[in-house]
From Swiss-Prot:
Pfam families: Rota_VP2
Key words of the record: Capsid protein, Inner capsid protein, Repeat, RNA-binding, T=2 icosahedral capsid protein, Ubl conjugation, Virion
Native species: Rotavirus A (isolate RVA/Human/Belgium/B4106/2000/G3P11[14]) (RV-A)
Quaternary data: Homodecamer; each decamer is made up of two conformers of VP2, called VP2A and VP2B. Interacts with a VP1-VP3 complex. Interacts with the intermediate capsid protein VP6. Interacts with NSP5. Interacts (via N-terminus) with NSP2.
Biased composition annotated in UniProt, kind: Basic and acidic residues: 19-30
Protein name (Swiss-Prot/TrEMBL): Inner capsid protein VP2
Lineage: Viruses, Riboviria, Orthornavirae, Duplornaviricota, Resentoviricetes
Record region (5-fold hub): 1-80
Stretches for region Disordered: 1-43
GO molecular function: RNA binding
Major localization listed first in the record, in broad terms: virion
Localization in the cell: Virion
UniProt note: domains: The N-terminus binds RNA. It is necessary for encapsidation of VP1 and VP3. The N-termini of 10 VP2 molecules form a cylindrical hub underneath each 5-fold axis of the inner capsid.
Post-translational modification: Sumoylated with SUMO1 and SUMO2. Sumoylation of viral proteins seems to have a positive role on viral replication.
Length: 880
């Protein structure tokens, strides 16, 4: 029986195995059926073969296609990333980029008052030069004559180019125009003086020397030079120096002397120069320990406001200015001292959170990123951003409730305008949906992008709780007050923030939230938020102190700003991590920090120097634009003038400023009036353009052309030449007009009718003293080109000289041959040097000292920081 039973068991086992195999076969059949149905329905094309190798190849092909598709995906991804990078680069190009922050700071600090304009020489365009005199037969006489010539003769040919030369000359005068002239500093000894007298500068001395040694100088002039010396009137602090100047140069220097920018300096001026709020701040003790002499002088800084309104429609330029101001402000915000130990604070926080007992992930996040460096960085960022009116963006993690609760303090203290709208909305929405609405069991807020109201404004209308709604109302209406102090527009914080009372309002709202039931949320969620609120509320006193400290440092440094604080959202933003705000709230100690007097003075000086330089460069640009228009420089690119203006401000990357802003800047500059000094200087140049042209050896003022040969005439300055000294009796045609219209018919008709014609305009004045080359060039260069090709712009009139210096002088001696030319160069006579008319007495102060750093005379100290008081006469930090 037993045997039989064993066999039966075996059979049963075999049967079971068969069944299992059958099941497997069925499964395989089903799989194959599904695979077949898939293959039939799928649109993929497959080749069915019996050959195993081909099947392997097909698998490999599949693998390779997969790899190719992967590679293609990667390529597409990189292409997308590349496109994003390109888009970002395009965006960056519309925003001027900056060099490292240190270099901007150095550029700003290196802008000094214009001490470089202190002159050691008088301004001169002309210098006297000796030229030989020629007799009637063309021979050079032994005696010479003095004429006024240009010191730097770079006059180009062509009327338009000459006018451009005068614009460049004007620009040069503007850069060299001294703020003050002290003749004693440049006076030198007159070598020919009997009693060691002095003349005004080294060039006057060298001119006197040359005239004294000239054999033809009259005895009376020599005696006069021997008498030339300074005349001092000590009781009036005045000295007169003799000078030898061309009348135009004299007009310039006399104007500079009469319109100096220096003003008398005394203790009152220095004390009033210090910003009023710092003078009246009881925390700063200012003292002057000496009186200034009566000869002390200073240059009043030019602090006009908002002449170009760069905040209005100049996004890139405004971004650059605010960035440089931000970097400067960060460098002067004091570092926090005696912060709470990070380890000790984290340990205390973890005890408060009971993290040993509870290991809730969200609560361990509360402690991440807390460190003293982040706290200090946050303090500096907040104050510097408000001082420079830089827009901030917030970076946060929604699950970190602690950073959101810290964000509630931040939004209470800092006005809404300081944050980029999208970032502000995101942060407010996170606070509403994570803390405020769950506390009252309200449904999540579904915020539509583009809604004119912020999440807090919507929440204020929906929440019934008075304390929470009251706090939301304060945040929604937290704006800067615009106040003009000492003529500067300041962005002032709300009084409730300045005295710290608003923190009590925030705490009342937080306590109300922590008492709520969070009905729709789990218990752990409610506990997490309650503990986060508890952590912040435990530091109520420190938060009040921190708010007062922030406001005091902001307002004290704000007193040193000289340009209007215009509030406009900036293109780029300063990033602020909410974890660093948590660090600041949790680690702030009880040590007061206030800016040192030296830091304040430095900040004030840098701001004054930049602002003054900004206004002076505006004046220069406006003057150059006006001059270009009055000189009819129709081809002058105004953009180049604007680029120069921006370069001279030092902080701009000019190549990256968009063109639309360049042209808008040009239009704004055109509307401004020209400063009086610069206008007077331009009028001086404009009135004397003719005299300056005459003194040039490079250009003539026109050319007379004719069919018939015109005889060469004797000229005192050159001998036998084809020069005409006047245009009487000739019909005149303006060369520039002729070249612009291109109508040469009038000239050719006149020439064909045997009438000489005078082409008036700035032409090259080239000397060619060889008679042979004169004859060779005559018809080929001048006459043929005018009549046949009708091209006036290629006309190169030549000054032909035939005199005793010439190797071919024997041709002149041969009276059978009369030298002639078909052109006559029209050249005006330069002004002759007359010693009596060129001797001028210049008057200036005998002595004075110009002080550039006025605050160097003020010794300043502060009270002990612990005793420093805020505007309400209460200590800044009360929590000890």
């Amino acid at each position: 029986m037993a045997y039989r039973k064993r066999g039966a068991r075996r059979e049963a086992n075999v049967n079971n195995n068969d069944r299992m195999q059958e099941k497997d076969v069925e499964k395989q059949d089903q799989n194959s059926k599904t695979q077949l149905s898939d293959k039939v329905l799928s649109k993929k094309e497959e080749i069915i073969t019996d050959n195993q190798e081909e099947v392997k190849i097909a698998d490999e092909v599949k693998k390779s296609t997969k790899e190719e598709s992967k590679q293609l995906l990667e390529v597409l991804k990189t292409k997308e990333e590349h496109q994003k990078e390109i888009q970002y680069e395009i965006l960056q190009k519309t925003i001027p980029t900056f060099e490292p922050k240190e270099s901007i700071l150095k550029k700003l600090e290196d802008i000094k008052p214009e001490q470089a304009k202190k002159q050691t020489k008088l301004f001169r365009i002309f210098e006297p030069r000796q030229l030989p005199i020629y007799r009637a037969n063309g021979e050079k006489e032994l005696r010479n004559r003095w004429y006024w010539k240009l010191k730097k003769d770079t006059l180009p040919d062509g009327d338009y180019d000459v006018r451009e030369y005068f614009l460049n000359l004007y620009d040069q005068v503007l850069t060299e125009m001294p703020d003050y002239l002290l003749l004693k500093d440049m006076a030198v000894e007159n070598k020919n003086s009997r009693d060691a007298g002095k003349v005004v500068d080294s060039e006057t001395a060298s001119i006197c020397d040359a005239i004294f040694q000239d054999e033809e100088t009259e005895g009376a002039v020599r005696r006069f030079i021997a008498e030339m010396r300074q005349r001092v009137q000590a009781d009036r602090n005045v000295v007169n120096y003799p000078s030898i100047l061309h009348p135009i140069d004299y007009a310039f220097n006399e104007y500079f002397l009469q319109h100096q920018l220096v003003e008398p300096l005394n203790n009152d001026i220095i004390f009033n120069y210090i910003p009023e709020r710092i003078r009246n701040d009881v925390n700063y003790i200012l003292n002057m320990d000496r009186n200034l002499p009566s000869t002390a002088r200073y240059i009043r800084p030019n602090l006009l406001q908002d002449r170009l309104n760069l905040h209005d429609n100049f996004e890139s330029l405004w971004d650059t200015i605010t960035t440089s101001n931000y970097i400067l402000a960060r460098s002067v915000v004091p570092d926090l001292k005696e912060l709470v130990s990070t380890e000790a604070q984290i340990q205390k926080m973890s005890q408060d959170l009971q993290l040993e007992a509870l290991t809730i992930q969200s609560e361990t996040q509360f402690l991440t990123g807390i460190n003293s460096q982040a706290a200090n960085d946050c303090f500096k960022t907040l104050i510097a951003a408000m001082l420079s009116q830089r827009t901030m963006s917030l970076d946060f993690v929604t699950t970190n409730y602690m950073s959101l609760i810290s964000g509630m303090w931040l939004l209470t203290v800092v006005p809404n305008d300081m944050f980029i709208r999208e970032s502000l909305v995101a942060c407010q929405l996170a606070i509403v949906n994570t803390i405020v609405y769950p506390a009252f069991g309200m449904q999540r807020m579904h915020y539509r992008n583009g809604d004119p109201q912020t999440p807090f404004q919507i929440a204020e209308q929906q929440i019934q709780n008075f304390q929470v709604a009251n706090w939301l109302h304060f945040v929604n209406n937290n704006q800067f007050r615009q106040v003009v102090i000492d003529g500067v527009l300041n962005q002032v914080l709300n009084d409730n923030i300045r005295n710290g009372h608003v923190i009590n309002q925030l705490m009342e709202a937080l306590m109300q939230l922590s008492r709520q039931q969070f009905p729709t949320m789990p218990v752990d969620y409610k506990r997490s938020i309650q503990r986060g609120i508890l952590l912040l509320s435990n530091r109520l006193g420190q938060l009040v102190d921190l708010t007062r400290l922030l406001a005091y440092n902001y307002e004290t440094l704000m007193a040193c700003i000289t340009m209007n604080m215009q509030h406009v959202q900036t293109l780029t933003t300063e990033k602020l991590q909410l974890t660093s705000v948590t660090s600041l709230c949790m680690l702030i100690g009880n040590a007061t920090v206030i800016p040192s007097p030296q830091t304040l003075f430095h900040y004030y000086n840098v701001n004054v120097n930049f602002h003054s330089n900004y206004n002076e460069r505006i004046n220069d640009a406006v003057a150059i634009i006006t001059a270009a228009n009055r000189l009819n420089l129709y081809q002058k690119k105004m953009k180049a003038i604007v680029e120069d203006f921006l370069k001279r401000l030092h902080i701009f990357d000019v190549a990256r400023v968009p063109d639309d802003q360049m042209y808008r800047l040009r239009d704004r500059l055109r509307l401004l009036p020209v400063e009086v000094r610069r206008l007077d200087i331009f009028n001086l140049i404009l009135m004397n353009m003719d005299q300056i042209e005459r003194a040039s050896d490079k250009i003539a003022q026109g050319v007379i052309i004719a069919y018939r040969d015109m005889q060469l005439e004797r000229d005192e300055m050159y001998g036998y030449v084809n020069i005409a000294r006047n245009l009487d009796g000739f019909q005149q045609i303006n060369l520039e007009e002729l070249m612009r219209t291109g109508d040469y018919a009038q000239i050719t008709n006149m020439l064909l009718n045997n009438q000489p014609v005078a082409l008036v305009g700035a032409l090259p004045f080239i000397t060619d003293s060889s008679v042979i080359s004169l004859i060779a060039k005559l018809d080929a260069t001048v006459f043929a080109q005018i009549v046949k090709l009708r091209k006036v712009d290629t006309l190169k009139p030549i000054l032909y000289k035939i005199n005793s210096d010439s190797n071919d002088f024997y041709l002149v001696a041969n009276y059978d041959w009369v030298p002639t030319s078909t052109t006559k160069v029209y050249k005006q006579v330069p002004q002759q040097f007359d010693f009596r008319n060129s001797m001028h007495m210049l008057t200036s102060n005998l002595t004075f000292t110009v002080y550039s750093d006025l605050l160097a005379f003020v010794s300043a100290d502060t009270v002990e920081p612990i005793n420093a008081v805020a505007f309400d006469n209460m200590r800044i930090m009360n929590e000890l």
